[in-house]
């Protein structure tokens, strides 16, 4: 029999409904797995008492025939989502010990639907990173290893704890956020599925902000179906978030069985970047073949401003971050380091509380917003953003239903491998994903195969605004063709 923590979310839902096991039993199975997996450092804090109390409520609901959509399903929460009464740190020393008195909209909707909270998941500090190496609470280690090697690998970032926990069976699914690829890249690195919904599909209320015009919440799970189930609960209008869109939430789970017959899938020629590994190109071609065999038409398209997306993103995002992170000053909450006066306290607190990568991005952002450089950098980057959005609009107007690209330019790299590199080398991990955030579009990463060293690789599908249903249908087609990747054996236990 499959261990309870190794079930998919859909299988666990069906098992709980059939009373094959209790919510308490599946919660305890996950808590035991978390205890055995401390070497991965996927969780910043586990919440066993809360999990078991929530599971008991779920068992009572199931016994009365009052089960809610996610009744009794144990989930991990990225530590960027405010959780009432539970430390919420954003992976930063400056928020050490901060316990919110409120719950994020996304997590409150999950609890409304009966989900069980296992704990808070590790991440790059303030979601700034592509490897989960910038967390003040230690690096998260990927459950994957290269064949014949014991060298630790990164799980991707910033949602590395979410992806690692899902891949290592430490939760059935996890919340995550995506500003430039922070759901899709770690999902690709860990053989999991991750979707960044359309900007505005999920409320940002109660999520610690990085770049407000780019941030969007979404799920990471082990299958396309599981992601569809979770997004159905996470999405929805919230009047507290002025960017939250007031439109009905579709039945995403029903969409996975639609298939792709009659759809047109675009292949952007600009994504064939110089130096792309041959195995990434082969996987991309294979993905197009799978969709063609399932009845889709494959069409080459042009997204001419793609080459400017990464530099424009690394102007817009740090600019917004420098503004958003100005609120952390040691006055009302979090770390406070005394100084000789109020200005000294601000300086000392921020110097001690922020990590190196966060300081770098705050400085870049402050620089591009300064009077002498605002027009030269920030305004120009926003103009590029508009052109990128128009490229996608033109592609969809030409009859394309979704766009297929690689999710990442490589498989996962080793812990510390990029530590001494130019920061731009790390930023290049987002080369295939940032355009989606700049245009506010939905994008999903789905596992499609393994590289020569046995590490997972993902394909990305990009959709029309608020057409996540087509993405789920196409992603399910790829998952069916590729087969589900066997997740790694528990070498850490």
Swiss-Prot record:
E.C. numbers: 6.3.5.7
Gene Ontology terms: cellular component? glutamyl-tRNA(Gln) amidotransferase complex
What name does this protein carry? Glutamyl-tRNA(Gln) amidotransferase subunit A
Give GO MF terms, alphabetically.
ATP binding; glutaminyl-tRNA synthase (glutamine-hydrolyzing) activity
Which keywords annotate this record? ATP-binding, Ligase, Nucleotide-binding, Protein biosynthesis
One Gene Ontology biological process: translation
Active site: residue positions: 78, 158, 182
What organism does the UniProt record list as the source?
A: Methylorubrum extorquens (strain PA1)
- Which reactions is this enzyme annotated as catalysing? L-glutamyl-tRNA(Gln) + L-glutamine + ATP + H2O = L-glutaminyl-tRNA(Gln) + L-glutamate + ADP + phosphate + H(+)
The answer to whether the entry has keyword Manganese is: no
User: Would you identify the family this protein belongs to, as annotated?
Assistant: Belongs to the amidase family. GatA subfamily.
Binding partners and assembly: Heterotrimer of A, B and C subunits.
State its role.
Allows the formation of correctly charged Gln-tRNA(Gln) through the transamidation of misacylated Glu-tRNA(Gln) in organisms which lack glutaminyl-tRNA synthetase. The reaction takes place in the presence of glutamine and ATP through an activated gamma-phospho-Glu-tRNA(Gln).
One Pfam family recorded for the sequence: Amidase
């Amino acid at each position: 029999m499959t261990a309870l923590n190794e079930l998919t979310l859909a299988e666990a839902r069906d098992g709980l409904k059939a009373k094959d096991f209790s919510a308490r039993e599946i919660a305890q199975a996950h808590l035991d797995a978390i205890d055995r997996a401390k070497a991965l450092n996927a969780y910043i804090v586990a919440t066993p008492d809360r999990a078991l109390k929530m599971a008991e409520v779920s068992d009572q609901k199931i016994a009365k025939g009052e089960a809610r959509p996610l009744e009794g399903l144990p989930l991990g929460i990225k530590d960027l989502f405010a959780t009432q009464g539970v430390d919420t740190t954003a992976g930063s020393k400056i928020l050490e010990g901060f316990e919110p008195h409120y719950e994020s909209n996304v997590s409150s909707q999950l609890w409304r639907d009966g989900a069980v909270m296992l704990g808070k998941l590790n991440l790059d500090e303030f979601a700034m990173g592509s490897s989960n190496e910038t967390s003040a609470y230690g690096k998260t280690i990927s459950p994957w290893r290269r064949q014949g090697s014991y060298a630790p690998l990164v799980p991707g970032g910033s949602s590395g704890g979410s992806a690692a926990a899902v891949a290592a069976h430490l939760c059935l699914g996890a919340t995550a956020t995506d500003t430039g690829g922070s759901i899709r890249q770690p999902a690709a690195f860990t053989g999991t599925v991750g979707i960044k919904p359309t900007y505005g599909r999920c409320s940002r209320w109660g999520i610690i902000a990085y770049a407000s015009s780019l941030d969007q919440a979404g799920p990471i799970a082990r299958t396309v179906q599981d992601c569809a189930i979770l997004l159905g609960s996470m999405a929805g209008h919230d009047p507290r978030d002025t960017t939250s869109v007031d439109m009905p939430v579709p039945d995403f789970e029903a969409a996975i069985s639609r298939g792709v017959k009659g759809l047109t899938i675009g292949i952007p020629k600009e994504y064939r970047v110089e130096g792309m590994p041959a195995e990434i190109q082969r996987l991309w071609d294979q993905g197009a073949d799978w969709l063609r065999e399932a009845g889709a038409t494959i069409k080459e398209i042009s997204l001419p401003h793609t080459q400017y997306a990464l530099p424009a993103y690394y102007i817009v995002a740090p600019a917004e971050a420098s503004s958003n992170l100005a609120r952390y000053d040691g006055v009302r909450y979090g770390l406070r380091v005394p100084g000789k006066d109020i200005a000294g306290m601000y300086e000392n607190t921020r110097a001690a509380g922020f990590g190196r990568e966060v300081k770098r991005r705050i400085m870049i952002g402050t620089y591009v917003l300064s009077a002498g450089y605002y027009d030269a950098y920030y305004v120009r980057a926003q103009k590029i953003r508009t052109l990128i959005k128009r490229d996608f609009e033109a592609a969809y107007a030409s009859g394309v239903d979704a766009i297929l690209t690689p999710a990442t330019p490589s498989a996962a790299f080793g812990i510390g491998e990029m530590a001494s590199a130019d920061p731009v080398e790390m930023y290049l991990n987002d080369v295939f994903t940032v355009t989606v955030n700049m245009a506010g579009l939905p994008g999903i990463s789905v596992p499609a195969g393994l590289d020569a060293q046995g590490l997972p690789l993902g394909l990305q599908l990009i959709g029309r605004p608020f057409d996540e249903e087509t993405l789920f249908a196409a992603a399910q087609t790829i998952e069916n063709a590729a087969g589900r990747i066997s997740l790694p054996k528990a070498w850490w236990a």
